[in-house]
């Protein structure tokens, strides 16, 4: 069980965090990489890090993206085994988004 202050990140996507421009249209692997970069940055800004992710929810618009998305996520979560839920949904908020990832982490005591 994780102990500490909770950090809840809303669903993150492959967007430039400053311009809101969608990046890597049509490429689920690169969208996942950018999404994980955003998550890493936001967790660090909150005082946490990927090592303290305790829950992750992954939304995919196509089940065929699952393997490459999870392989890319695994590069960012080496040695971390959070509770995980994966969902296939008909669409995300913007048609160019192929994957959205939501995480909960802690700032350890």
Predicted features along the sequence, with ranges:
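Short, polar/acidic, helix-capping and beta-turn segments at strand->helix junctions
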Residues: 1-109
């Amino acid at each position: 069980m994780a102990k500490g202050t909770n950090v809840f990140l809303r669903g993150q996507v492959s967007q430039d965090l400053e311009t809101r421009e969608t990046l890597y249209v049509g490429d689920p692997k690169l969208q996942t990489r950018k999404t994980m970069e955003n998550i890493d940055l936001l967790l660090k800004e909150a005082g946490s890090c990927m090592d303290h992710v305790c829950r992750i929810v992954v939304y995919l618009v196509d089940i065929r993206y699952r393997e490459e998305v999870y392989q890319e996520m695994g590069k960012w979560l080496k040695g971390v085994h959070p509770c995980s839920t994966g969902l296939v949904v008909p669409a995300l908020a913007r048609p160019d988004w192929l994957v959205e990832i939501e995480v909960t982490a802690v700032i350890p005591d």
